[in-house]
């Protein structure tokens, strides 16, 4: 299911997460990687490695709604950032194009209630985008 959400966004051009002039689409020449919008990279403060979290499919952070494609360059650039630094790096154009509105301001990744609330809001936005696209396709 993660791949379907990523592919839905990939079906139309969107700006890279942190660099506006890096456009991502199906024809991107840069290597693309799946990326957690709420990243796993700063998990040391809850005693779990990012590899452990990645493998825990029941963890809320592995929700399909928490994935997008970014360039490998961007993935490397943000991987070592704290959550607060990472949140500041996301450009407005990417937030709008990828339905990353009201990004959850969390101190650490154990704040599951805030993350869940944000994922539910993103679900509503993504669902609306899909319905709009399907309606447009059916009416043409």
Annotate each language-model stretch with its function.
Residues 2-3, 65-68, 124:
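Non-catalytic, well-ordered alpha-helical scaffold segments
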Residues 60-92:
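Short Cys/His-centered divalent metal-binding micro-motifs
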Residues 1-37, 41-42:
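Aromatic-lined ligand-binding clefts that engage carbohydrates, nucleic acids, or primary amines
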Residues 43-46, 78-85, 110, 138:
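Short conserved micro-motifs at the rims of enzyme active sites and ligand-binding pockets
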Residues 35-38, 68, 72-75, 127:
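Generic hydrophobic alpha-helical scaffold/packing signal
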């Amino acid at each position: 299911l993660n791949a379907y959400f990523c592919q839905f966004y990939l079906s139309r051009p969107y700006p890279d997460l942190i660099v506006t002039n890096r456009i991502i689409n199906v024809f991107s020449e840069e290597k693309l990687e799946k990326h957690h919008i709420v990243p796993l990279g700063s998990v040391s403060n809850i005693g779990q490695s990012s590899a452990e979290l990645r493998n825990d499919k029941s963890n809320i952070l592995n929700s399909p709604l928490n994935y997008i494609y970014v360039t490998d360059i961007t993935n490397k650039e943000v991987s070592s950032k704290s959550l607060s630094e990472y949140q500041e790096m996301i450009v407005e154009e990417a937030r709008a194009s990828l339905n990353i509105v009201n990004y959850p301001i969390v101190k650490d990744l154990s704040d599951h209630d805030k993350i869940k609330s944000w994922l539910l809001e993103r679900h509503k936005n993504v669902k609306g985008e899909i319905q709009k696209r399907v309606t447009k396709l059916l009416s043409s």
